[in-house]
Amino acid sequence: MHASPLRTLASIALAALLSCTAHAKPNILVILADDLGYGELSCQGFTQQIPTPNIDSIAKNGVRFTSGYVSGPYCSPTRAGFMTGRYQQRFGHEFNPGPAEAAVENFGLPLTEKTIGDRLKAAGYATGWFGKSHLGYKPPFHPLKRGFDEFFGFLGGAHSYLDAAGDKHNPILRGTEQLPAITYTTEEFAREAVSFIGRHKAGPWFCYLPFNAVHGPLQATDKYLNRFTGITDTKRRTYCAMQSAMDDAVGTVLAKVRENGQEENTLIFFFSDNGGPTAQTTSGNGPLRGFKAQTWEGGIRIPFMMQWKGKIPAGKVDDRPVIQLDIHPTALAAARVEAPGDAKFDGVNLLPYVTGEKNGAPHDALYWRFGQQIALRSGDWKIVKGAGMDGIAGGRAGKADTAGAELYNLKDDIGEKSNLAGKNPDKLKELAALWDQWNAGNIDAAWGPGSRGKAADSAKPGEPAQPKRRKKQNN
């Protein structure tokens, strides 16, 4: 079989791309929004209420994935998935750890897991983390012990934008030292990232910038509120101001990359940790059904884009399903960092797909488990069960039996309005069996609702959770 000319050119382009990075490793910038819904960015095409030219520029200069997902509908678990490149259910990080002083404060991203920071630091990268953590409160889980040279941010799940102390258990930290005062967290995190990039101009550097925007509390300064005087709803106006501030902050960081002359040697990702929590007031999800904490599309499909100017196509829209787990192996591939054979990534290297060397789908299927809720997408088909349940409150998924399961064709029905389960029982059974096969490789939640090991009640402070391997279900 002879390769097509286009495929040959794509292979040559990818080989050249990786060849150059062998001598000059690219910088890597990962920008994470908090609770940003699928429908709020202007580049997504559903609303122009909040101009986001800087975030939009990443899509303009790179690839925007319209079927971009995260591996759960909730905050800390998807961050754990990004950090490891693995489904968080593989190591029991199914729910949020904390808050501080609660029974689950002793838990976080298991110490047995290697992070993207660990691997890039070992490869000679300067590594910096500026913003939210939410991967554990205790010292063993601190970013400075998870592969990062610098940290400026907070360890918990939510924080005041204006008060450095936040609550007494979750202050803004520089390294391990508490700051006495801040201006506005969104601006502060961007300034710290800019400083880091400036100090490491010689490269290579990895900058992780997880904003707490646009997560509550709803707080903004007059600078941003004054941009939306035509909005009468106070909450919506404040939300718009918060998102506008985040876009400005992204612009500040991107400008520093350009100032350093590093735009063509910097791989950039932007995504959100889960879907928006409400329909209109605080981050909407456009045409998608459901919200944060639900496994309908509105909870798990998110804005997702990547840029590597001059190396991957610009202005490309790609509808193939991808997931935040892919960022870790993609970054390692770009950096020519070979992960050990036991890394067991669930994510894949996206570079050959965006350059055209590979034409198929990066994933045969994507999977979700969040308490009682389950979901799977394979091609255009999606099975979902328990999406309306409160996965945070209790219960856990067993087998994906078809009773009560919903089936949708997302190509024709992105809003999940027409349940086709009754018309396609064979497809429903096929996807349920596929989910069961995936879930057999997971373990029970290490803490939180439905956790069997009762780790939250028994482990010592600072010890990683030791959840139990899932047993085969008979029901």
Residue ranges: model-predicted function:
Residues 2, 9, 13-406, 414-437, ...:
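Formylglycine-dependent sulfatase
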